[in-house]
């Protein structure tokens, strides 16, 4: 029989495990997790530490899903079961553990594209940020908040949080990946307020740094973001090249982000009038979105297919926009409503164009209201 292991020793390992998770060191994190699970069998009783382990296990799963996404039904245990177990002990969480609960729950809701819910949890976590002493941990939180605000176009909130995070990451050489991701967010926000050239400067820097990291995911993401900026500048030919490169890398490594890249490629082919290529990309993208069970992109693919490759049925388009709005994906709806209205205007279907312009104004109003919540 093994001697009881002091909980302090296990706590040290839990902290090391979390550092590996934050750094996306999946293999090392998995090995240490197994070691900790073995230690827990003979650890002296400490309920707080067991709760800490449950929270870190949940965060570990989020990390793995980011690096190697799999369908939730294929995982053991499912996210929902892990959440239920943690929430059943929520009343026991105080201080730092309560911070982790809200922070990780926010990350989960962000993963599910429930952006408003994610922000709500992050706000609760921010109230507990005083319990966080580690500077990198604060930077991680700031980065995550910047990320979700970017997705709902709360530009200045996002820029503020991203800049604070970047200031911290710049002090630490090991956090090159996060520096690149902060550059992505800052550039995306600059694009949203039409400072495209400034955004491109950040993105070219991010692409160079991503190549130095030699990480396929980051390189593909950098190509995608440069493509998005070129698209915003109206340089469709160059954007097409960047999207093709991003899609190829994402697909080669079986990253879920391939769905997004192929959607952007399909969209740009449609706008360029390259309909044969658009059909090929659409078939590729809709298959990928179905395999990943990505309802948002299934809806977006259906929408642009109907708009550019189908008959432009108003009922189908309206149903697609209703679905996007019901998921609070207002920024996505805004961009596609603009294209839909412009498309009908070009086709001289002025009544339909006016209908979608009015809906676009409605979405802009909702986004503006969110900025003051």
Curated annotation (Swiss-Prot):
EC numbers on record: 3.1.3.-
InterPro entries registered for this protein in UniProt: Bac_ResReg_Asp_Phosphatase (IPR051476), TPR-like_helical_dom_sf (IPR011990), TPR_rpt (IPR019734)
Binding residue positions for L-glutamyl-L-arginyl-glycyl-L-methionyl-L-threonine: 147, 150, 181, 192, 217, 225, 228, 260, 297, 300, 335
Record's keyword terms, sorted: Allosteric enzyme, Cytoplasm, Hydrolase, Protein phosphatase, Repeat, Sporulation, TPR repeat
TPR repeats: 99-135, 146-179, 220-253, 259-292, 334-367
Cellular compartments annotated: Cytoplasm
Molecular function GO labels: phosphoprotein phosphatase activity
Regulation: Inhibited in vitro by the competence and sporulation stimulating factor (CSF), encoded by phrC. However, CSF has at least three targets (RapB, RapC, and RapJ) and the physiological importance of RapJ inhibition by CSF is unknown. Interaction with CSF induces a conformational change in RapJ.
Free-text note regarding domains: Contains a small N-terminal 3-helix bundle domain and a large C-terminal TPR domain, connected by a linker region.
Subunit structure as annotated in this protein's UniProt entry: Monomer in solution. Homodimer.
Biological role stated in the UniProt entry: Involved in the regulation of sporulation. Acts as a phosphatase that specifically dephosphorylates the sporulation initiation phosphotransferase Spo0F and inhibits its activity.
Name of the protein in its database record: Response regulator aspartate phosphatase J
